[in-house]
């Protein structure tokens, strides 16, 4: 009797061990949905919260006949005080450079992102001595859309986003 119980326990344990492999090895036929996040690791969309996000699409850029990023920047309702310098008579050392100044808080208070990543500062200083991101190096034809966060986002992005964030998506 003892051997038959022992044998039964062995068969049962072998069945449980090898029987569960088929359960684990089953294929999963679920479709995987692609999720693209630009800007931050905080979940949500521009319409979820109270943050005012303006999205300038490729169609709008084409309708503006924008040939430079300065043309796009000049048409932002929240932009104030950008130094988009094209000639040497008014610009000094910043000739040919463009920048973004949201709400007139200064060139260093607006964060500029390229596909959600921080852009490096230019090697030149503005007329007031501040260092900024030179947006004239961004090709307009490569821009798919521009996302503008119109409020301070220093708690999410850091101190250089006090005035807001401009994200150029390619």
Kindly give the residue locations of the regions a language model identified.
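Extracytoplasmic beta-strand/coil segments of soluble accessory domains associated
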Residues: 74-118
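Extracytoplasmic
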Residues: 32-34, 48-53, 64, 97, ...
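Short, glycine-/polar-rich solvent-exposed loops and beta-turns at beta-strand/coil boundaries
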Residues: 28-30, 49, 79-96, 126, ...
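Flexible glycine-/small-residue-rich
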Residues: 39-41, 57, 102-106, 114-116, ...
């Amino acid at each position: 009797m003892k051997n038959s119980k022992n044998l039964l326990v062995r068969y049962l344990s072998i069945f449980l061990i090898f029987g569960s492999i088929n359960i684990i090895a089953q294929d999963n036929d679920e479709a995987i949905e692609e999720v693209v996040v630009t800007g931050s690791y905080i979940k949500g969309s521009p319409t979820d919260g109270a943050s005012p996000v303006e999205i300038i699409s490729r169609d709008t850029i084409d309708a503006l006949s924008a040939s430079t990023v300065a043309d796009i920047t000049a048409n932002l309702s929240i932009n104030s005080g950008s130094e988009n310098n094209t000639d040497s008579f008014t610009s000094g050392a910043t000739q040919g450079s463009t920048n973004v100044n949201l709400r007139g808080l200064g060139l260093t208070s607006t964060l500029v992102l390229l596909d959600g990543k921080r852009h490096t500062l230019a090697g030149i200083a503005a007329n007031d001595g501040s260092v900024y991101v030179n947006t004239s190096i961004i090709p307009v034809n490569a821009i798919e859309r521009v996302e503008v966060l119109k409020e301070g986002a220093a708690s999410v992005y850091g101190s250089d986003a006090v005035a807001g964030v401009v994200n150029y998506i390619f």
